[in-house]
């Protein structure tokens, strides 16, 4: 369901399937850059329940308004966020320590911010989701990508 307007547009993204594809793309388990993942999805594709899926194109998104437009036009986007030692319960809490980076799906938005889905399961945030306020946007993402 599209969390912006309640329509039936499918916003479910299997981040684990994309990450797991790197086994054939890279010989080591040091993570994967967005550019490598998107290149793989465009040229090799990712197996889904509905068959092999390939993206046609991808591009970076750099602003709140551009991200909103990309979600409406293309569906979920992917973004890289810093990971703090408080990240299992909340994105960031005062006094938290930086531990690394992580990819998430940005699946929708409302008047207060973006709805984020993580691949860590239902124990993370609020049943696997969290809400990122617009005022925290510029200090949150390393990069954001949209794809068609």
Describe the role of every protein-language-model region.
Residues 1-148:
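Catalytic-core signature of thiol
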């Amino acid at each position: 369901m599209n969390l912006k307007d309640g329509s039936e547009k499918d916003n479910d993204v299997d981040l684990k399937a994309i990450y797991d594809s790197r086994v054939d793309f890279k010989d080591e388990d040091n993570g994967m850059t967005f550019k490598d993942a998107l290149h793989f999805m465009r040229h090799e594709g990712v197996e889904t329940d509905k068959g092999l899926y390939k993206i046609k194109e991808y591009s970076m998104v750099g602003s709140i308004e551009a991200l909103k437009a990309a979600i409406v036009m293309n569906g979920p986007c992917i973004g890289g966020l810093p990971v703090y030692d408080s990240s299992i319960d909340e994105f960031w809490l005062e006094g938290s320590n930086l531990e690394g980076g992580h990819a998430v799906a940005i699946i929708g938005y409302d008047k207060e911010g973006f709805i984020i889905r993580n691949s860590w399961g239902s124990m993370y945030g609020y049943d696997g989701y969290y809400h990122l306020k617009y005022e925290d946007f510029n200090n949150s993402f390393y990069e954001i990508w949209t794809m068609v």
